[in-house]
């Protein structure tokens, strides 16, 4: 009979397998400690929303982002203003997330939610491409993101994003929000200024317009939204997605575009 002294067993050094297993575990889906309520927003309103309580904390979001498909590819146009309620936090926020060299995503809603989950999507897309030795399709990438956010439905995520790119089926554009909604389409606009942007976009859209006309349409649509929407502004960034990937076209300050698009006439100018 063999007697083993378990109290004096020496700790072995971690092997290469243990190290790799630890790395793989680290790369798995991020896990968060969720609140013990099915819907934290409803719980807070039911618990604290009564006449004697101070005004409840309101998470107000504002932005203008749009994307559309035309004959020459896909145009993505966004503003760069970030607000915290009535306070302007920044005028130089990057609202286009460069997921992969062939995929772009936009952010509207909570900046942290959009940025974190779209970067997580980029990690998963790169792993897919390494394992399968082919580019991931836009449909698959958008489905991955929709499945991720759906698992957190009701837990306070705030996200409205457009996933766009060019794959084997051609230019593709999808809309995904924090409820797991996933829509495929040709033209989308998201954010508090989207109503104004849609008006300009739908009026000026032509499938066979050239690239410069498409850039100008995306720029004008977001600009007019920033002119009327208090929560949009800063610079207007325009991207062009083509078969060989995406490229950034321009970044124009809204104040300079105001001088370009509006012919300001003095009030006291005599009539002709």
Curated annotation (Swiss-Prot):
GO terms for cellular component: cytoplasm; cytosol; nucleus; proteasome core complex, beta-subunit complex. The keyword Nucleus applies. One of its GO terms (molecular function) is endopeptidase activity. It catalyses: Cleavage of peptide bonds with very broad specificity. The active site is at residue 63. Residues 1-62 form a propeptide. GO terms for biological process: proteasomal protein catabolic process; proteasome-mediated ubiquitin-dependent protein catabolic process. The proteasome is a multicatalytic proteinase complex which is characterized by its ability to cleave peptides with Arg, Phe, Tyr, Leu, and Glu adjacent to the leaving group at neutral or slightly basic pH. The proteasome has an ATP-dependent proteolytic activity. Belongs to the peptidase T1B family. This is Proteasome subunit beta type-5. The gene is psmB5.
């Amino acid at each position: 009979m063999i007697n083993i002294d378990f109290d004096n067993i020496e700790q072995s050094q971690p092997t290469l397998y243990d190290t790799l297993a630890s790395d793989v575990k680290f790369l798995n889906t991020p896990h968060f400690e969720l609140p013990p309520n099915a819907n934290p927003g409803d719980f807070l309103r039911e618990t604290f929303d009564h006449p004697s309580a101070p005004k409840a904390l309101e998470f107000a979001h504002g932005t203008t982002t749009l994307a559309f498909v035309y004959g020459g590819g896909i145009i993505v146009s966004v503003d760069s203003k970030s607000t915290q309620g009535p306070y302007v936090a920044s005028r130089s926020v990057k609202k286009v997330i460069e997921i992969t060299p062939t995929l772009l995503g936009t952010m509207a809603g909570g900046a942290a939610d959009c940025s974190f989950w779209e970067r997580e999507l980029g990690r998963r897309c790169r792993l897919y491409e390494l394992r399968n030795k082919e580019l991931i399709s836009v449909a698959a990438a958008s489905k991955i993101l929709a499945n991720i956010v759906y698992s957190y439905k009701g837990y306070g995520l705030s996200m409205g994003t457009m996933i766009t790119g060019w794959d084997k089926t051609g230019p593709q554009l999808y809309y995904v929000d924090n409820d797991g909604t996933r829509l495929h389409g040709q033209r989308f606009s998201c954010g508090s200024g989207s109503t104004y942007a849609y008006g300009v976009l739908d009026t000026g859209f032509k499938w066979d317009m050239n690239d410069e006309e498409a850039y100008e349409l995306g720029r004008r649509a977001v600009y007019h939204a920033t002119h009327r929407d208090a929560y949009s502004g800063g610079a207007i960034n325009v991207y062009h997605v083509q078969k060989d990937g995406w490229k950034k076209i321009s970044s124009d300050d809204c104040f300079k575009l105001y001088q370009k698009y509006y012919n300001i006439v003095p009030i006291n100018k005599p009539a002709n």
